[in-house]
């Protein structure tokens, strides 16, 4: 009877389901084993690599013996020294590559190789092992054949010597080298699966990519060669030019200016010791020039040899840009030196002007200014700064004959021109002046120099000043001198009132001159003075005496000039508004004949500050250093101020011309200003004019000066007698808003009249005084319904 074989029971569903997670965990376990193997292999390879690189022949090893107690130099210790000695003796220099190869093989064996170039079929561990062994044999033999150094082991070690000797004996030197190279390539393929066709393909791609790069380099080399040829040609041209220059006449060099300006008669008188010491108490005496600092001796500018060298450099630099020109003259000055250039026929001035920065770079200077037109000459000017800049003192200018011979009490000492001659200007001929420049360009110092030049020229009987100083720093130092019409204005609301007073004074003077029959202030003063000298003083035609009060007719007196200084009118326009611009424009249009003149200064030369209305009425301008050509065109309607040197270097545009003059401003210290101010304070008390800063400026005929400078009706005095007062009162009490602009808009009246109505309500207790934010509270109850 056949034995019945028991039937295998099928696995239960629960068991089979329990095995599925184990199968799923197999890749995770394999990854874990690979990571552990890599962690174990990496330190061994590092140890082997360190032992090889720190090998020392003095250490005991396989090929030599040493003392047991002697120190071991190898980082791997005695074991490392033995291993390194064995590997180096067996494999030679290939031993250093052995850890890297073993590491790469371990990585491939553990993680696989999924990159391009991997053989599609799995070669198996046997072939990989064969490839590794073949690589060791081939590399040792190759090194022994190519790098034999005479040692016993040689570069390829004992193994390399055996392989190379065996192959050389059978195949000769050529056959041995070819056999070793082929074996090396095949073993690399077997060990790594690398495809040499892929390697050749990649090398081909690199070669193709290298083509455009080589083409670019070749193009650059060609350009360099052409540049070198052009440079050699220029050198040849320069040599020819040098021969021509040796035969040409030297540049005409004007002598430098004298360091000391010739003193005037007044300066000589001030140096004499007076017989009677004392100070005038009526302010009629002018301050002595001894209050100012004397100029100090300073270094000279360029020498004649340096000027000649600079002339040649300018010509060579222009020739680099294919511009033929010849320097025909050099004019050294205290701050800059002007070179006069005569361009060749057909050369445009714009070609030279566009090279100002390149010329400055070529001459190693800060900036170069190109003067397109020099009156009376057919040359172009190049203004180059001196290495050592001369400081110009205000005392030099005020002691000069040019300043002393000027009969006008409004003489301004601006500075020195490029030749070192004093530059003075008459404010009465300008008749107004606009000064603009960036911060630190010397604008404030120039304004102080202008003020002092007026104070040293005219007494307070001949000249009065109104100073507006929004910054409260520059002009406030003059507080208390007899020349001021009012205290130095720092509140911009009072500044607008002061300008309205000037408009009212201008209109009053015009009426006086019309009644007397003269055309300007000088004629008026001459006629009044002649009448006084004849013993028949002229009576004031505008004064209406009141017989009931016993008033007698008032005789006319000479009128002083009035100069209005505004240090930063950009801030004033921002605070007060556009109405100040209209007041300034009205004064600039009509105030010349009345003897009222404006000097405006700003550090923000933008079109919203220096507007077309101001520029049209103030043609005389001074531009200090600015940051761009746009700012220069805003001030002067032409470029050039951006190339100035700062510290008082300016372009002065005189009246009646479009060609600015370069002037170097005078320096005046704070100590000098304080000494002059203290002297003027001691010479006479202040004589402020009443009502200069009042908000309402009447013109004597029942009208007042409006916000724009035009006359407006007083509206019955601006109190409760105004016919619109009741209507304005109703509007304010109904709306509960005491706003000047609201009353002005609802009643369609002027700003000044609306302001007077609000002030009348304040006086009557209807509204409160303005609070810190300008708002008023309506105190009166609303009208009954």
Swiss-Prot record:
Pfam families: FtsK_4TM, FtsK_alpha, FtsK_gamma, FtsK_SpoIIIE
Top-rank taxon: Bacteria
Localisation per UniProt entry: Cell inner membrane
Limits of the FtsK domain: 420-633
Cytoplasmic side of membrane: 200-785
Molecular function terms from GO: ATP binding; ATP hydrolysis activity; DNA binding; DNA translocase activity
Binding locations of ATP: 440-445
Membrane topology: Multi-pass membrane protein
InterPro entries recorded: AAA+_ATPase, FtsK/SpoIIIE/SftA, FtsK_4TM, FtsK_alpha, FtsK_dom, Ftsk_gamma, P-loop_NTPase, WH-like_DNA-bd_sf
Region of interest (Disordered), residue spans: 1-26
Alphabetical list of CDD domains matching this protein: TrwB_TraG_TraD_VirD4
Keywords attached to this entry: ATP-binding, Cell cycle, Cell division, Cell inner membrane, Cell membrane, Chromosome partition, DNA-binding, Membrane, Nucleotide-binding, Transmembrane, Transmembrane helix
Ranges of biased composition (kind: Basic and acidic residues): 1-13
TM stretches of this protein: 36-56, 91-111, 123-143, 152-171, 179-199
GO cellular component: plasma membrane
GO biological process terms on file: cell division; chromosome segregation
Subunit organization: Homohexamer. Forms a ring that surrounds DNA.
Domain notes: Consists of an N-terminal domain, which is sufficient for the localization to the septal ring and is required for cell division, followed by a linker domain, and a C-terminal domain, which forms the translocation motor involved in chromosome segregation. The C-terminal domain can be further subdivided into alpha, beta and gamma subdomains. The alpha and beta subdomains multimerise to produce a hexameric ring, contain the nucleotide binding motif and form the DNA pump.
Function of the protein: Essential cell division protein that coordinates cell division and chromosome segregation. The N-terminus is involved in assembly of the cell-division machinery. The C-terminus functions as a DNA motor that moves dsDNA in an ATP-dependent manner towards the dif recombination site, which is located within the replication terminus region. Translocation stops specifically at Xer-dif sites, where FtsK interacts with the Xer recombinase, allowing activation of chromosome unlinking by recombination. FtsK orienting polar sequences (KOPS) guide the direction of DNA translocation.
Similarity remark: Belongs to the FtsK/SpoIIIE/SftA family.
Protein name as annotated: DNA translocase FtsK
Species: Xanthomonas campestris pv. campestris (strain ATCC 33913 / DSM 3586 / NCPPB 528 / LMG 568 / P 25)
């Amino acid at each position: 009877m056949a034995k019945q074989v028991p039937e295998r029971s099928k696995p239960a569903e629960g068991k089979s389901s329990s095995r599925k997670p184990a199968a799923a965990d197999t890749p995770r376990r394999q990854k874990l084993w690979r990571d552990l193997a890599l962690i174990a292999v990496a330190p061994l390879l590092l140890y082997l690599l360190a032992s090889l690189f720190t090998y020392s022949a003095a250490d005991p090893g396989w090929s030599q013996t040493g003392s047991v107690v002697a120190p071991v130099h190898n980082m791997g210790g005695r074991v490392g020294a033995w291993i390194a000695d064995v590997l180096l003796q067996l494999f030679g220099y290939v031993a250093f590559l052995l850890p890297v190869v073993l590491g790469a093989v371990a990585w491939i064996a553990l993680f696989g190789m999924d990159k391009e170039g991997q053989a599609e079929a799995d070669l198996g561990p046997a072939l990989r092992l064969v490839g590794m062994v073949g690589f060791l044999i081939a590399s040792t033999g190759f090194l022994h054949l190519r790098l034999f150094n005479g040692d016993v082991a040689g570069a390829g070690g004992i193994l390399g010597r055996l392989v190379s000797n065996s192959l050389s004996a059978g195949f000769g030197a050529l056959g041995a080298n070819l056999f070793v190279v082929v074996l090396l390539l095949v073993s690399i393929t077997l060990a790594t699966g690398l495809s040499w066709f892929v390697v050749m393909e990649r090398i081909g791609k690199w070669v193709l990519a290298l083509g455009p790069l080589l083409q670019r380099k070749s193009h650059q080399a060609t350009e360099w060669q052409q540049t070198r040829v052009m440079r050699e040609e220029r050198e040849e041209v320069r040599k020819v030019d040098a021969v021509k220059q040796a035969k040409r006449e030297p540049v005409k060099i004007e002598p430098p200016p004298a360091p000391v300006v010739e003193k005037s008669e007044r300066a000589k008188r001030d140096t004499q010791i007076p017989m009677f010491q004392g100070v005038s108490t009526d302010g009629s005496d002018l301050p002595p020039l001894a209050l100012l600092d004397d100029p100090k001796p300073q270094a000279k500018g360029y020498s004649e040899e340096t000027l000649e060298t600079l002339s040649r450099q300018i010509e060579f630099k222009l020739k680099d840009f294919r511009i033929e020109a010849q320097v025909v003259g050099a004019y050294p000055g205290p701050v800059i030196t002007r070179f006069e250039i005569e361009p060749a026929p057909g050369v445009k001035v714009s070609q030279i002007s566009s090279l100002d920065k390149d010329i400055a770079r070529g001459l190693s200077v800060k900036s170069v200014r190109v003067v397109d037109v020099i009156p009376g000459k057919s040359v172009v000017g190049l203004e180059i700064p001196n290495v050592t800049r001369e400081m110009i003192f205000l005392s030099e200018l005020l002691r000069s004959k040019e300043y002393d011979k000027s009969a006008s009490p409004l003489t301004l000492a601006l500075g020195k021109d490029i030749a070192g001659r004093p530059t003075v200007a008459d404010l009465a001929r300008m008749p107004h002046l606009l000064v603009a420049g960036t911060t630190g360009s010397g604008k404030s110092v120039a304004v102080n120099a202008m003020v002092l030049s007026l104070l040293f020229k005219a007494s307070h009987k001949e000249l009065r000043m109104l100073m507006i100083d929004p910054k409260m720093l520059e002009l406030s130092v003059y507080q208390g001198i007899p020349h001021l019409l009012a205290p130095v204005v720092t509140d911009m609301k009072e500044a607008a009132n002061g300008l309205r007073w000037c408009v009212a004074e201008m209109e009053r003077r015009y009426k006086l001159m019309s009644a007397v029959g003269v055309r300007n202030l000088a004629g008026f003063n001459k006629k009044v003075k002649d009448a006084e000298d004849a013993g028949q003083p002229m009576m004031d035609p505008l004064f209406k005496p009141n017989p009931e009060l016993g008033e007698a007719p008032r005789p006319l007196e000479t009128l002083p000039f009035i100069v209005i200084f505004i240090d930063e009118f950009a801030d004033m326009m921002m605070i007060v508004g556009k109405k100040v611009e209209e007041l300034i424009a009205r004064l600039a249009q009509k105030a010349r004949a009345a003897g009222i003149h404006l000097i405006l200064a700003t550090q923000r030369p933008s079109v919203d500050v220096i507007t077309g209305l101001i520029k049209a009425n103030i043609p005389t301008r001074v531009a200090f250093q600015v940051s761009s050509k746009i700012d220069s065109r805003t001030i002067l309607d032409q470029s050039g101020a951006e190339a100035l040197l700062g510290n008082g270097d300016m372009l002065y545009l005189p009246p009646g011309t479009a060609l600015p003059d370069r002037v170097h401003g005078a320096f005046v210290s704070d100590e000098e200003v304080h000494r002059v101010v203290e002297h003027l304070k001691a010479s006479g008390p202040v004589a402020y004019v009443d009502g200069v800063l009042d908000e309402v400026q009447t013109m004597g005929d029942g009208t007042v000066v409006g916000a724009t400078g035009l006359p407006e009706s007083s509206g019955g005095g601006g109190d409760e007698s105004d016919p619109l007062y009741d209507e304005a009162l109703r509007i304010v009490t109904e709306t509960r808003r005491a706003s000047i602009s609201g009353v002005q808009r609802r009643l369609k009246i002027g700003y000044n009249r609306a302001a007077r109505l609000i002030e009348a309500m304040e006086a009557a207790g209807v509204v409160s005084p303005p609070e810190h934010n300008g708002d008023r509270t309506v105190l009166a109850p609303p009208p009954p319904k």
